């Protein structure tokens, strides 16, 4: 009987189930979107029960459409939108409030208070993160402080907390496994990434009882099995878990120290594997856990760019410059350069390395001769410049010079952007055959745990390149262009 690995990719706007075979190829996939809730400006929430329902739906659709029987699944891997926090009742299994999403700013005031109390340095040292509404810890505190009776129940040990991976493993296992992996734990603001424990000092700071927290386990391990009721009568091992960006790093086979990937989605997330050492950042990067496997923990440096693919959507929907995102490449290629135009797409502030939430988008260098083509090209180029900002920070922090950059995500189909990215970085850019690297990473982690794949060397062999973009731009030209970008950033920051 042919066996497969089922990867569950629980994202910010949709849930997907993807079946992979022994060669790491996609056999079939199913996707279902779910509701976004915006109760107040800047707040973003999800219904955790609806997410669970969407997961069950995509599993059923994927297996039936692929004509694969449940007993053909060798293991399940889970990858998830990180930081999003769920708190539920241990007895009823029902969430006591909506899941507060990573994008949500509803805990900004809590963060300001913690910063004012001088906790910033301690948090940075222990977690590798900044005090920010982005991470799970303040979201849990907010739920306990704002939902009636929640704090008392939590103190009595009646509530459980989890990021989305934890919630799904708990549901699939029928409440038997309350676990998370190192990569997800490292995004909570409650986990010490050096001694690999929930940290009492951090928990006291956030007033979160330890009894709520899941057990932290390696990213590739059997955590439990599906209960018959949720998996068509089968007990399938749930065997791999990693946060979405870390899963993509694993799916890109970036196993060596100094290897890096950049995911071009709504935003961009660039991760560099720093091996078994946690590199503290002096340049606005986050230090995070990549994965834990075979008794070892790998660390990574991470840079976040808030606006990437969403800038292309803005050109399409907001500015109505084209009907399909793929047309952006055609327009951008019609002109030799932007003619000195720079677009800084700081629609929601700037991420790494600036961390400035007050700035807004801007455009510079416009003349009477500026056309739609120049404008589109400048917007695409901004993605490459922002990536260079992150890479410069990574090389400065790690002391490692990047040899090649592996890329994935929706915008990598844009050949113009990938070539310009290579030119601006002066580094080859490699696009893989399989772009679904996040789901693939979770599948690999699960497959290794159940012996479906032997080891990481076997996985490395499966990574195949679709196209390699080599830098051909003169160093002087790329330096000049990048200097113009830095000037545009400074001018943008001055206008508030």
From Swiss-Prot:
Which residues carry the post-translational modification Phosphohistidine, per the record?
230
What SUPFAM superfamilies does the annotation carry?
Actin-like ATPase domain
| Top-level taxon of the source organism | Bacteria
Q: Where does sn-glycerol 3-phosphate bind?
A: 12, 82-83, 134, 244
Query: Which InterPro entries does the annotation name?
Result: ATPase_NBD, Carb_kinase_FGGY, Carb_kinase_FGGY_CS, FGGY_C, FGGY_N, Glycerol_kin
Q: Gene Ontology terms, cellular component aspect?
A: cytosol
Question: Under which main EC class is this enzyme filed?
Answer: transferase
Q: What is its EC number?
A: 2.7.1.30
Under catalytic activity, the entry for this protein gives:
glycerol + ATP = sn-glycerol 3-phosphate + ADP + H(+)
Q: What are the GO MF terms of this UniProt record?
A: ATP binding; glycerol kinase activity
Sequence positions that bind ATP: 12-14, 266, 309, 313, 410
List ligand-binding residues for ADP.
12, 16, 266, 309, 410, 414
The protein's UniProt keywords, in alphabetical order, are: ATP-binding, Glycerol metabolism, Kinase, Nucleotide-binding, Phosphoprotein, Transferase
Which biological process, per GO, is one annotated for this protein? glycerol metabolic process
Q: Which of this chain's residues are annotated to bind glycerol? A: 82-83, 134, 244-245
Q: Which CDD domains does the annotation name?
A: FGGY_EcGK_like
What this protein is reported to do is described as:
Key enzyme in the regulation of glycerol uptake and metabolism. Catalyzes the phosphorylation of glycerol to yield sn-glycerol 3-phosphate.
User: Which family is this protein grouped under?
Assistant: Belongs to the FGGY kinase family.
What does the subunit comment say?
Homotetramer and homodimer (in equilibrium).
Q: What is this protein called?
A: Glycerol kinase
> Which species does this protein come from?
Bacillus thuringiensis (strain Al Hakam)
Q: Which gene encodes it?
A: glpK
């Amino acid at each position: 009987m042919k066996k497969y690995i089922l990867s569950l990719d629980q994202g910010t706007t949709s849930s997907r189930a993807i079946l992979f075979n022994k060669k790491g190829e996609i056999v079939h996939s199913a996707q279902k979107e779910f509701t976004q809730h915006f109760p107040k400006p800047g707040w973003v929430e999800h219904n955790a029960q609806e997410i669970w329902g969407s997961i069950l739906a995509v599993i059923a659709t994927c297996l039936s459409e692929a004509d694969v029987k449940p007993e053909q699944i060798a293991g399940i891997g889970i990858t998830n939108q990180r930081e999003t926090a769920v708190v539920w009742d241990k007895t009823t299994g029902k969430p006591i409030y909506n899941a507060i999403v990573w994008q949500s700013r509803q805990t900004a005031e809590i963060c300001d208070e913690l910063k004012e109390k001088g906790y910033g340095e301690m948090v940075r040292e222990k977690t590798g993160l900044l005090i920010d509404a982005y991470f799970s810890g303040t979201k849990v505190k907010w739920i306990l402080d704002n939902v009636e009776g929640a704090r008392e129940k939590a103190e009595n040990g009646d509530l459980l907390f989890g990021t989305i991976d934890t919630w799904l493993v708990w549901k699939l296992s029928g409440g038997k496994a309350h676990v998370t992996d190192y990569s997800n734990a490292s995004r909570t603001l409650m986990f010490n990434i050096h001694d690999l424990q929930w940290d009492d000092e951090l928990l006291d700071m956030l007033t979160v009882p330890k009894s709520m927290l899941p057990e932290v386990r390696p990213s590739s391990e059997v955590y439990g099995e599906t209960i018959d009721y949720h998996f068509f009568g089968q007990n399938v091992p749930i065997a791999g878990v990693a946060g979405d960006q870390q899963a993509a790093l694993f799916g890109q086979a970036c196993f060596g120290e100094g290897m890096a990937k950049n995911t071009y989605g709504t935003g961009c997330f660039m991760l560099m594997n720093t091996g078994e050492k946690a590199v503290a950042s002096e340049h606005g990067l986050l230090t995070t856990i990549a994965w834990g496997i075979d008794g070892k923990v790998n660390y990574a440096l991470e840079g976040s760019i808030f606006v990437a693919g969403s800038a292309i959507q803005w050109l399409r929907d907001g500015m109505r410059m084209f009907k399909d995102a793929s047309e952006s490449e055609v327009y951008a290629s019609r002109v030799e350069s932007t003619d000195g135009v720079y677009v800084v797409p700081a629609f929601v502030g700037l991420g790494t390395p600036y961390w400035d939430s007050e700035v807004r988008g801007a455009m510079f260098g416009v003349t009477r001769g500026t056309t739609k083509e120049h404008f589109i090209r400048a917007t695409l180029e901004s993605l490459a410049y922002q990536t260079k900002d992150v890479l410069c920070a990574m090389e400065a922090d790690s002391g490692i010079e990047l040899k090649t950059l592996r890329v994935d995500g929706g915008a990598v189909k844009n050949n113009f952007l990938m070539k310009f990215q290579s030119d601006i970085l002066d580094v080859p850019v490699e696009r893989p055959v399989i772009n679904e690297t996040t789901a693939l990473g979770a599948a690999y982690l699960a497959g290794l745990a159940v012996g479906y794949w032997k080891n990481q060397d076997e996985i490395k062999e499966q990574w195949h390149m679709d196209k390699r973009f080599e830098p051909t731009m003169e160093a002087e030209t790329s330096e000049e262009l990048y200097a113009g970008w830095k000037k545009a950033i400074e001018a943008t920051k001055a206008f508030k």
